[in-house]
């Protein structure tokens, strides 16, 4: 099931980048998303409605958004991804190039929790590993 979980995470990331609403089928109804401490909003979003609100919030802040997954740690029911994000701030016009790290928790092939971290080491530790 582990590799399947990695594939689910990649499909969610790819679907989000395409703006594909079918991506919600891979996300549990009771999902919790916790923004990383490096992001200005610092919010926690709940359920499909929350995920959709996060997309709206994100698109209000950023344009020309690009994301590349740099590394993936397959941890069974958890997956850690290290991403490179590039975008332009809509209000500031400033081009941003930053690394983010996400810890994804899956149950029955769906994402139930997605939490952002400031560093890869912090996410791996939260997943029960030390880097």
Question: For each predicted feature, which ranges?
Answer:
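Short beta-strand edge/turn micro-motifs at domain boundaries
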Residues: 102-125
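Hydrophobic beta-strand positions in extracellular immunoglobulin-like domains
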Residues: 85-87, 106
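A short hydrophobic beta-strand element
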Residues: 76-85
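Short, surface-exposed coil-to-beta transition loops
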Residues: 65-67, 95-102
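Short, cysteine-centered beta-strand-loop-beta hairpins and adjacent loop/turn segments enriched
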Residues: 87-95
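A solvent-exposed, acidic/Ser-Thr-rich amphipathic alpha-helical stretch
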Residues: 21, 26-77
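Short acidic-aromatic low-complexity motifs
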Residues: 2-30, 130
